[in-house]
Amino acid sequence: MLETKEFKFTSTPEKGEVSALLVRPDTATHLLVLGHGASSNMRTPMLGAIAEGLAGHNIATFRYNFPYSEKGGGRNSQATVTETIRSAVQAARGVCPDLPVFAGGHSFSGRMTSTAQSESPI
């Protein structure tokens, strides 16, 4: 069975809440926190296909939006983006405390997740 739940979490104190989407198979062994590309959001069909494919391999996903993709406007500063990534990982750990957590993303969020990790462990 596949569990799908929507959540909100605080991205940064200044930017407020953003949306997240958990896709968790009953047999999940790991959780991937998965960010989107610069010009899309967590509901892009590609990320949906990735989440579905990973679920078939017992990997849960926690997709999330950045504040700019949630509320409109221009892209957020690097500091806001990396803080949002850290907040997403923390929120994912709270939702699935029983699973080892990994973080990554498509294009922009993949680079920014690497940047956040290089600044200080996520």
Model segments located where?
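Serine-hydrolase catalytic machinery in alpha/beta-hydrolase-like enzymes
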Residues: 7-100, 115
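Nucleotide-activated sugar donor-binding and catalytic core shared by glycosyltransferases
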Residues: 4
